[in-house]
């Protein structure tokens, strides 16, 4: 096993997610940018709590987790979200965690529904149930290169509840980063369109936040 590990390090050496330095997943300098705090924003009336500012280093960590499925990057995102869930004040309990789903194309490319997978692991650690009730109901574009207005248009009407989904009580939407709020806003709309607004509250937790929202 050690021989295989040594060989893999020769072919695919461990590099810092942030700066590419050899030898460790995240170096001391980049780790200084990845110390979770609590950042509060709003998407319309929905409260959003995030653990870190969305920096170039944070962007690289998210890409390493999302597009390459590197476990070390996953764990950095998971720890940031858990920090927020444990430290932020969400009011009435209990809550359930609702992950933002990936498109079918993204799931095929990555081999998983990224945030659903992370939220499942988070749920097991913090003991808050996961409610995987949302699905993408039509084709959407990659949000990364879109302006704010185009992101809103891209996500408008994109989410629906899964068949036989049951949504009761207070819910926390989970995502990796909030930049414009278009995705979280659409997720809240999908919940409220099913009459959920009358029976509970919707808030959100993300690992990172782009300040100010774009």
List PLM regions with ranges.
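Glycine-rich phosphate/pyrophosphate-handling loop used in enzymes and phosphotransfer proteins
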Residues: 1-214
